[in-house]
Each structure stands twice: as structure tokens, then as C-alpha cells.
């Protein structure tokens, strides 16, 4: 149902139960869910079973009284055609044809905003994701973060939040020094395995590319920074460091552009030190008695806030442990007015959650417990040609986001080749690969491991889940083209006020009813996915919606001779196309109007 319909029906049920309960009774909220079997109706409610014990009555008897009261309520009679009691006290509901028609009209009227809440309904939210070290190409784990984080940010925006996307660069750790000496070694003509090659050095081919550009005195720039020109002096480690970091930030920017992800801000860890924020946070914790010294180190009393043991903040050599700048960084989020913050990170960061939260609580500046929220994801395994791919030649030790996009795109075209050729709209050349990677990485819950099958991503048939969904959209477009010609989109307005009885009446095909029911669930699905920080739910929904469409398409011919029936079915397809388009937009995947199709395997 539409949210307004749900509220109206819930109010009728609530009033019915309240009239049967003592005035001071604490009643649960009335909720509805889809029955497991379509034969049981459109919705089910278990309120009678929830409150029967407290009211000292039989659940079925209570359910009957609720049903009698709801049937007499005009708010419900406009929406419900039938109410039935099942099992120990479930109340099954069948919606009226008018209620079904109201859903289709709402989709057609709201268009690209169907399922969205009013802009500004909520406050500000900051979503931090990817946040890779600028020491190498983005790997598939970063790709999963990018897909999750961007889809989650879109979801929150659809729910009326003002969303700020942020990328935190860890550009102040020991890994940056390792990057610099790796490039320096390459610039000196060394390669992995040679005598004198640093043991901790990065081995990917990208290090040789950086070294070559550094020796050539080239200039590079990241999206938010000043250009950096290489000095070419292989003894100047600081110059190498600056050039290498900027070079890799630019490479990561290219990968994110190919992936269709944009950030509002890139926040540098190094700025927390140069601005004195790290030291200020530490001194504040000391002043508030949240630290102590032991074994030559400074410790934070994280056990005061639920951690299993206290943690070292400052080591004996005077350097800070890695969670300390994180505390300072999250303080800036709070000070910038973000009362809601969500971090999307790999599950290997689980151990830092309690430490960061304990540090924030220790500062005693009003930050609520449980701040920030976290979405943790597990690893991704890549399969290609039936075998696991563990190493990328470019990265040296892992598969990159760029690898996945190019492999899943089909053909021989590469991102580097497009850039070197000066192709202006090069990201559009990789739409197929981007769509596949984004959809695949959202097709499982974040907290489950995922196997990315490149061979499956390349298939152009129903075995490929992203193709299956996109083809539903393209097939609908082809039906409209057959109906309205090349300018069919301009004619969709004709369907806004058609008689919808042929797709909403009680005696129409179950496939038509199921498809309309799925369209009605879209707003509530988005709200739940946003609340639960679960963007995978959108991908799940889209696969179900595509399945319902294909079932309807196979059951009911659309372009029939009967004009009334034809227009009603076209209106149902127009609404389906709109919801497919909206859902794909939420997860950052395109909705093509034409698609090639290969034969399914025998």
C-alpha cells in the first residue's frame, strides 16, 4: 500500500483494538506484512495475537471483534474488499480495486519522485565511505564500499535527509613512507626481487608508472588539491612522497569517476596533525582523567565505555596509534553539525569501533553513545574463467575496481586507453561494466562474503541479475514503442486517467494483481532499507519486481484489440517502468531503453 493508505488502515485497526482494551493499556503499533501465500490476500495483521493475552481473551475471538469494528470504519471500507480470520488469529486483508488503482495513479503522478520523501524532512547526515589509503589503486573491497556507501547515501536522500558524502584519506601513516621508498627504488632502476629492493615495498606495476612520471618531471593533481610537479630528484624523498600521493589520489579519482561516485569533500588525515586537532583531542582526554600512563605508553580508559580492555593511545616512541586521529576526525564531524554519521568500512575495522566511540565519549562534548553508526562489509572473491583471481598485474597483490569494471564491460577498451586518447565522455564507455559491478556488489547483505563472477556479469540473458532487471525496463520500453512509435514517451500522459479495472478488479489475472502489489511496496521498502542501513534490499526488490513483470508479460498480452484493456495494461507497465527506473537510480545503475539479448543455454 501507499504510506497514506497504510496510515489510514492502521488508524482504523488501532481504534478498533483500543475500543476493546482498558483505557490505560499499552498497545503495540499496528503493522501489516505480506502473507507468505498470495492466496491468503494482500496483507496480514497479527495485532489480535499480540494483545490477546494482556486482554485475557481468545485471539480468534478478539480478531473477530476487530474485524467487525474495522468493517464499520469508513477509513477501512474505502481500502479493503475483504477481511478474513486465519489460523490462531491472523487477520488477512484483500485490498479493494480502487485502492489498487490509487497506487498506479500515484506512481504515474509522482514519476521520478515516487517513493521519495519531501526534501528536508530530516536533518543532515554524513556518510563516509571508501576512505582508501593513497598508496595504491582501489581494490574490490573499496568497490564494495563505494557501491554500498553511494547507494546508502542515495537512499537517505530519497528519505528526505540532506546527505554529505565524505572520503577520508589516511595520508599520514607509515604506509605513506613505504609508498615513497617504493617509488624511489623504482626510480633507481630496481624492481621486486632485486638486491636492494625494500622488503616492505609495494610491488605493483603502478609503482613503476609513478617512478617514470616522477623522473619525467610531470605534473599531477587530485580533484580537490593543487597540482604537484615532480622534481625528478630521486634523493628528494619528500618530493617523491608528495608526487606519489597526488598521483594515486588522481588514479583513485579516475576509478571513482568510472564507478559513478562523487564526494562532497576529501578530508586529509594529515590536516588533523597540522591543525593541531589530534594533539588537542589527546590533551582534552588527559585533562578529563580518561587516560593513564603505563609501561612507557599513554593509555585510554576504553573499558569505561564497554571495550574489553584499555587501549594504547601514544606509544613509547611518541607516535600515536591509528585510532587516535580517528577520534579527532569524528570530533570534526560532530562540530560541523552532523548529528547523524554513518561509516561504511571493511569488517577488519570492527575492533576500532569501541575505541573510537570510547574516545568520543571521553571528550564529554555532548556526542551521543553509539556515534557514529557503522556498516561493515565482508570480503569479495573474484572469479574469472571459472577460477579465482587473486592478483592483478597493475596492483601487484589484489584485484582492482578498474579491473572489475573493464572485465565486466566486455570488449578490449580500457580506461587508460580512453584517457590517453582524450575521449571526453569516457565514463559512458564503461556504463555496462559499472552497472554490473555496482549491482553485483549490492546483491548480497554487506555482512556476508561475496563471490563476484565476471563470466556471469558478461552474460546478456536472465542468468545475469543486473541484465534481468534492466531487460525488464527495456522490454517495457519496446512495448511502448510498438504502441506509440518513436515519440512514445510524449504519449505517456494519455495513461494518467484511464480506466484501470482491467488490471485492478478482483477477477483479473493473479499476475496483474501481484505486479500492482509489488509497486505499492516500493515506498515502504525504501523507508525500511534506509532505516536499517541496508541498500541491498533495493537490489533484492528490483529482482522481485522484474520477476513479477516477466510473469505478467507472459500471462497477459498488452497490445490487445480492446482499447480499454490495452490502456489499463499499458498504465500498469508505465508504473512498472517508472519504479524500475527509480529503484535503479537509487543504487546508481542505468535504466537502458534498448538491450541486446543472447539465447539462454539449452
UniProtKB/Swiss-Prot annotation:
Record keyword NAD present: no
Keywords: Aminoacyl-tRNA synthetase, ATP-binding, Cytoplasm, Ligase, Nucleotide-binding, Protein biosynthesis
Compartments where found: Cytoplasm
'HIGH' region (motif): residue ranges: 132-142
EC number of the protein: 6.1.1.19
GO molecular function, one term: ATP binding
Gene Ontology biological process terms from the UniProt entry: arginyl-tRNA aminoacylation
Any one GO cellular component localisation term in the record: cytoplasm
Record field: catalytic activity: tRNA(Arg) + L-arginine + ATP = L-arginyl-tRNA(Arg) + AMP + diphosphate
Short name of any one Pfam family annotated for the protein: Arg_tRNA_synt_N
Transmembrane regions listed in the UniProt entry: none
SUPFAM superfamilies: Anticodon-binding domain of a subclass of class I aminoacyl-tRNA synthetases, Arginyl-tRNA synthetase (ArgRS), N-terminal 'additional' domain, Nucleotidylyl transferase
Assembly, per entry: Monomer.
Family: Belongs to the class-I aminoacyl-tRNA synthetase family.
Stated name of the protein: Arginine--tRNA ligase
Organism in which the protein naturally occurs: Cupriavidus metallidurans (strain ATCC 43123 / DSM 2839 / NBRC 102507 / CH34) (Ralstonia metallidurans)
Lineage, broadest ranks: Bacteria, Pseudomonadati, Pseudomonadota, Betaproteobacteria, Burkholderiales
